């Protein structure tokens, strides 16, 4: 009616981090989005978020991402990378549970892309000393070892 597209996500029906839904939409392991489109949609989301927060008198989104204190430029991107790690690991676990608990094999091919995207997000975090955490490197090492082992098993078959 008003020529606006609205996306309503009731998957978990609860409030969560501001970055959860955009990460779910743009980095879903079983939906391929080219990087140019993803970047364009992400930029539009960031601008819309800032505009809506200002319009509602909520202040800057960068200040609201974490109530612990003032934020600096790029913090929203850091929170996106952190959310990608959390959301993609959740997705990989969900896909595995669909197979083990329900016998559904249709999501199995999405586990590897989810883990590879998790590795990319961890590398982005580790590439910025202000963003990196000691646990990020350990998690990246474990995931890469798993993916390497998994690839070797597949090649032997």
What are these regions, as identified by a protein language model?
Residues 93-157:
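ATP/Mg2+ or Mg2+-diphosphate-binding catalytic cores
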Residues 15-62, 82-102, 114-122:
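Active-site activation/catalytic loop segments of kinase-like enzymes and analogous catalytic loops
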Residues 2-5:
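Active-site beta-strand-loop-beta-strand hairpin of nuclease catalytic cores
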Residues 7-9:
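Pre-DFG segment of protein kinase catalytic domains
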Residues 68-84:
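All-alpha amphipathic helical-bundle segments outside canonical DNA-binding/catalytic cores
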